[in-house]
Regions:
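FAD-binding core of flavoproteins
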Residues: 1-27, 31, 140-147, 226, ...
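Extended amphipathic alpha-helical segments enriched in small hydrophobics
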Residues: 4-71
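Glycine-rich flavin
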Residues: 87, 100, 158, 165-274
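Secondary-structure capping and boundary motifs in well-ordered enzyme cores
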Residues: 39-57, 75, 79, 148, ...
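Intrinsic disorder at enzyme termini
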Residues: 1-19, 91-156
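Short secondary-structure subsegments characteristic of cysteine-rich extracellular domains
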Residues: 61-88
Length: 274
């Protein structure tokens, strides 16, 4: 790790230590004979949800640190900012939830606290934003895509610009249903089958392809674009892991073609769909 990223690495390491401490504490509350008791888990569901969220953010920060190591100052600065945001978010949550957790959590002191304060200053964030805006291309730095992934990105970017973005504002502001014509066009593009193996009528390549497609559709509209690709992915993965072969043969081709449109019903403790 270069010196330019040393403070970021130190702070994220401390975040990982704190989360492991909380995770062990919660595991002691929900575990029975080395298994999770769902009733006990339900009693600490908000805390478990937050631990999962902060773990995801911390893991993303660790991946970003690895990525930035191979690039320059612009990428370093973006990475430092994300690491600081991740640690500050975790610090706020632990500080106000220690009584609920029943645990004194290892905090961010000294150098780590100074790092967060420095990176989250308004002037620093503004300077990073201006640097992103000023770049003619790759505002967030190079992705490192292969030629195939670049082609996927271009294809979905074009579709998002031409088909999704023009209806995004109307759909969102007036709470309209996604037009049938857009769903049909998505089916023809293979949007619904991008997470389904070809033996079941899909066109799964790899998870990076799914991420690229989701990002480009979300750029056009999260509601009318990005969310449409994640719903069949959630359902397809559940069927692939837990379904019988008969269920896979019956449902997956219909999902991949768009014949059956998938929706989800979820609950998030203390969040939007609670």
């Amino acid at each position: 790790m270069t010196d330019a990223l040393a403070a970021s690495q130190d702070a994220i390491t401390q975040a990982r230590i704190a989360l492991e401490q909380i995770g062990r504490h919660l595991a002691g509350k929900v575990g029975v004979e080395r298994r999770v008791d769902t009733q006990r888990l339900n009693r600490v569901q908000p805390e478990a949800f937050q631990v999962a969220r902060h773990l995801a953010q911390t893991t993303a920060a660790e991946a970003m640190l690895q990525w930035a190591r191979n690039h320059g100052e612009h990428e370093h600065e973006l990475t430092r900012l994300y690491c600081a945001m991740t640690c500050a978010d975790l610090s706020r949550w632990t500080r106000f939830n220690e009584p609920q957790l029943g645990l004194k959590v290892a905090g961010f002191d000294g150098i780590d606290a100074d790092f967060m304060t420095e990176m989250l200053a308004t002037e620093r964030i503004s300077a990073i934003g201006q640097a992103v805006i000023a770049r003619d291309s790759l505002p967030a730095g190079p992705y490192g895509h292969s030629e195939t992934h670049q082609m996927v990105q271009q294809q979905f970017a074009r579709f998002s610009d031409e088909k999704v973005a023009p209806i995004a504002e109307e759909t969102h502001c007036h709470d309209k249903l996604i037009p049938e014509e857009l769903l049909q066009a998505m089916g023809e593009l293979g949007v619904f089958g991008i997470s389904i193996p070809d033996e079941y009528g899909g066109m799964f390549m790899d998870h990076r392809t799914m991420i690229i497609a989701t990002e480009e559709l979300s750029r056009g509209s999260l509601g009318a674009g990005g969310s449409v690709i994640t719903r069949p992915e959630i359902c397809a993965k559940a069927i692939l892991v837990g379904g019988t072969e008969e269920q896979k043969q019956h449902w997956l081709p219909k999902i991949a073609s768009g014949e059956h449109i998938v929706s989800v019903a979820v609950t998030e403790p203390d969040a939007g769909s609670d």
